[in-house]
């Protein structure tokens, strides 16, 4: 059989492709528009197509040329929360409407399994910590709303067309392939750890810590972090779960251990050996005190066991990437 990875040139998707190629059990087909992804991030052993998943004619061609594809792993989506607040229609068009087009083509070609990279942003400001799969989903931004709508669309497609699905919900992804060959390269960069490491590199002057009066031990936001290889393993376990005939269901993924912004900063200083200047700033609106996802269900049902369960190990892998490629993939004008 073969697996189609959508968004396989992106940060998490490229690690998924790398993991699949490393296993060597089935052919890997990648589709990416390269709007935010990087061609150099895609393992050379994967079969690559550049195009938009919302282009039905293009996607039909991909499935037609790869009749062994029986499953889709879907990472292709816009994911900037702040941008989604300013450009909500862009997110509903690309993320939500794109899912409709994809499912139409999957149904046409009889592809019955999809593992979907969702987000814990579908929960909004949660009623409980750690967040469980049963926690009410009340997104507070168009990005989270678009992903929740995608989950809903898949639910009804399962009932109507028998397309089985697993949405995986998680928060902060951090780290890179330990040999430093692939990693995180966003433009603009909005994630805490790569920004901290850019300060360590001298690319940025300082890191801004937004808010020091949250209801947490040191007053800064607490978040959980998961490595992209651990996410890749979870996606593959979820796919195997579906292939074994199990029902569609959602799983939360996370370390189940929270780290504050200051703890991440101190750990990065230790790993890099750099001072990493920091400055405190006012809170950003809409930032909850603590966000930690419970991964108990994934561990019990899927047998998921994160290998990168030490935050310093995660940071060290990211630092290896930043040290190897200080300008990232350097493929943007």
Curated annotation (Swiss-Prot):
SUPFAM superfamilies: NAD(P)-binding Rossmann-fold domains. Gene3D superfamilies: NAD(P)-binding Rossmann-like Domain, UDP-galactose 4-epimerase, domain 1. One of its GO terms (biological process) is galactose catabolic process via UDP-galactose, Leloir pathway. Its EC number is 5.1.3.2. It catalyses: UDP-alpha-D-glucose = UDP-alpha-D-galactose. InterPro entries: Epimerase_deHydtase, NAD(P)-bd_dom_sf, UDP_G4E. Pathway: Carbohydrate metabolism; galactose metabolism. The active site is at 143 (proton acceptor). Transmembrane segments: none annotated. The keyword Disulfide bond does not apply. Substrate binds at residues 119, 143, 172, 191-192, 208-210, 223, 284-287. Keywords: Carbohydrate metabolism, Galactose metabolism, Isomerase, NAD. The keyword Cell inner membrane does not apply. NAD(+) binds at residues 11-12, 32-37, 52-53, 75-79, 94, 119, 143, 147, 171. GO terms for molecular function: UDP-glucose 4-epimerase activity. It comes from the Bacteria. Homodimer. Involved in the metabolism of galactose. Catalyzes the conversion of UDP-galactose (UDP-Gal) to UDP-glucose (UDP-Glc) through a mechanism involving the transient reduction of NAD. Belongs to the NAD(P)-dependent epimerase/dehydratase family. This is UDP-glucose 4-epimerase. It comes from Streptococcus mutans serotype c (strain ATCC 700610 / UA159).
């Amino acid at each position: 059989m073969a697996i189609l990875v959508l968004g396989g040139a992106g940060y998490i998707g490229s690690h998924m492709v790398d993991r699949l190629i490393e296993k060597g059990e089935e052919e890997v087909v990648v589709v990416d528009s390269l709007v935010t992804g990087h061609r150099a991030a895609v393992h050379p052993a994967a079969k690559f197509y550049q195009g938009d998943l919302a282009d039905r004619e293009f996607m039909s061609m991909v499935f037609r040329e790869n009749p062994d594809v029986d499953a889709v792993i879907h990472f292709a989506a816009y994911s900037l929360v702040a941008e989604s607040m300013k450009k909500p229609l862009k997110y509903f068009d690309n993320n939500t409407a794109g899912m409709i087009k994809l499912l139409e083509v999957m149904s046409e070609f009889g592809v019955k399994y999809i593992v979907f990279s969702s987000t814990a942003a579908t929960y909004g400001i949660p009623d409980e910590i750690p967040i469980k799969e049963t926690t009410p989903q009340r997104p507070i931004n168009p990005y989270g709303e678009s992903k929740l709508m995608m989950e809903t669309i898949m639910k009804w497609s399962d009932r109507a067309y028998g397309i089985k699905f697993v949405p995986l919900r998680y928060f902060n992804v951090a780290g890179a392939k330990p040999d430093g060959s692939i990693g995180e390269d966003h433009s603009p960069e909005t994630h805490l750890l790569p920004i901290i490491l850019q300060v360590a590199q001298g690319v940025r002057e300082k890191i801004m810590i937004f808010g020091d009066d949250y209801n947490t031990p040191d007053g800064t936001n607490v978040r959980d972090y998961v490595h992209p290889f651990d996410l890749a393993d979870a996606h593959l376990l979820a796919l195997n779960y579906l292939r074994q005939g199990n029902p569609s269901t959602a799983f939360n993924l996370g370390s189940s251990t929270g780290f504050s912004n200051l703890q991440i900063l101190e750990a990065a200083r230790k790993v890099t050996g750099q001072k990493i200047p920091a400055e405190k700033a006012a809170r950003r609106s809409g930032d909850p005190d603590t966000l930690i996802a419970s991964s108990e269900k994934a561990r019990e049902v899927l047998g998921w066991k994160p290998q990168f369960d030490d935050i310093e190990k995660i940071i060290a892998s990211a630092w290896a990437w930043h040290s190897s490629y200080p300008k990232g993939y350097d493929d943007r004008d």
